[in-house]
Amino acid sequence: MAVMMRTQAPAATRASSRVAVAARPAARRAVVVRAEAEAAPAAAKKAAEKPAWTVPTLNPDTPSPIFGGSTGGLLRKAQTEEFYVITWEAKKEQIFEMPTGGAAIMRQGPNLLKFGKKEQCLALTTQLRNKFKLTPCFYRVFPDGKVQYLHPADGVYPEKVNAGRVGANQNMRRIGQNVNPIKVKFSGRMMSPAEI
């Protein structure tokens, strides 16, 4: 009897579920609205009208952020070697951390800051981009006064995609297609990177 009850109970629920499915209304139709094909050429025209990127020029009269500390003597080498200058445009006055230690207040509008090392400019660039959503760029200034624009090299930061950018030190092959290292090491001759 107990076995019979177990088999009969699920049958009753199955029948009730069939009735519930049959009582549902039919599915509704979905209407798909598509934009006209004219929108794509308009976007292509906007991309074609974009002006070519040009290297920004350094304005030495740009004010520096308000900073009470010093660079630790790192700019003394600028008399014989080069130093680095970072510039950015701030929306408002804000306090930021200096890569050399301490804090400074960036001015509203253009800012210019000198450093002795390129790494300090990169560190400040990371902070300004991540925390303040600014777009800094930096330059190398030689002792004779010549200025070289450094970063971002083609106007787009390295982690972004830029059409036409050529990869540096790029091998277009899988790791399994590399030459066996033993053949290179014990060959008795130097191999060029093209052969490897």
Swiss-Prot record:
Going by the UniProt record, its keywords in alphabetical order are: Chloroplast, Membrane, Photosynthesis, Photosystem I, Plastid, Thylakoid, Transit peptide
Record GO biological process:
photosynthesis
Indicate the residues annotated as transit peptide: 1-35
Localization recorded for this chain is: Plastid, Chloroplast thylakoid membrane
Q: What is a single cellular component term in the Gene Ontology annotation?
A: photosystem I reaction center
Q: Does the keyword Plastid apply?
A: yes
- Provide the transmembrane region boundaries: none
Predominantly, its location class is plastid
One Pfam family matching this protein: PsaD
* Statement: the UniProt record of this protein carries the keyword Thylakoid: yes
Which SUPFAM superfamilies does the record cross-reference, listed alphabetically? Photosystem I subunit PsaD
Q: How does it sit in the membrane?
A: Peripheral membrane protein
The record, for InterPro entries, names: PsaD (IPR003685), PsaD_sf (IPR036579)
Described by its record, this protein's role is as follows: PsaD can form complexes with ferredoxin and ferredoxin-oxidoreductase in photosystem I (PS I) reaction center. PSAD may encode the ferredoxin-docking protein.
Q: Which family does it belong to?
A: Belongs to the PsaD family.
What protein name is recorded for this chain?
Photosystem I reaction center subunit II, chloroplastic
Q: Which organism is it from?
A: Chlamydomonas reinhardtii
